[in-house]
């Protein structure tokens, strides 16, 4: 991610992102902290795509890790709680890691697609030209709890648009 964000195609012309800032943005995206040492509007849509993929990888990694951890930790919890966890994830109580990961990925993408679609509709109503991509970017960022936004003012421009905040 760091090296990709260093290529001129990923940031706006006339603006150079120092290596340390590219590294910080990459780590922040993967760790889903949402911190940035640069104005996020410095990145192009291609740059936001890279950042979105990093957020997605970090978010899916965290959710998958904790789900698998709960599966194995359930061996140390009561029989009732173990059965609740098993029943929650599969009907036949035969938990397999691959099935759980597949379920997590499908649900994650499904929720993000729904959120992105709704956000795109609202962003279009607000005159955003790139409403589809920015809707998806915001949905991924919100779902993974990353807190990144593709605007220089974060989401302040939508301060009087509760519909956008409700979706996020």
Model-derived regions, located:
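Membrane-proximal intracellular helices of multi-pass ion channels
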Residues: 1-168
